[in-house]
């Protein structure tokens, strides 16, 4: 299982390995889901909410995204596809 920090900054996969944006991880890994969303890092914030499995965090990300994008999406919107975030079981991490 990936750590929270590796999961939220995963930019893709190469076979059984997650490819992680090391620069973004170093800069933003300590931020909460709310702080990531407030900074406009919606993909990372969404990933963090998915990783935590906390519905309140997911609602917070959606509300912050809607305010920034002037949209009115709810949980039924396919945010997984929008942000390209899908939980995947991998054990290896490659940091770029």
Language-model segment annotations:
Residues 1-96:
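Extended alpha-helical solenoid/arm regions of large eukaryotic scaffolding proteins
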């Amino acid at each position: 299982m990936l750590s929270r920090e590796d999961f939220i900054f995963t930019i893709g996969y190469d076979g059984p390995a997650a490819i992680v944006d090391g620069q973004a991880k170093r800069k933003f890994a300590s931020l909460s889901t709310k702080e990531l969303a407030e900074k406009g890092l919606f993909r990372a914030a969404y990933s963090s909410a998915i990783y935590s499995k906390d519905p309140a965090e997911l609602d917070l990300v959606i509300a912050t995204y809607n305010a920034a994008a002037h949209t009115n999406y709810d949980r039924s919107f396919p945010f997984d596809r929008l942000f390209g975030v899908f939980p995947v079981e991998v054990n290896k991490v490659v940091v770029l």
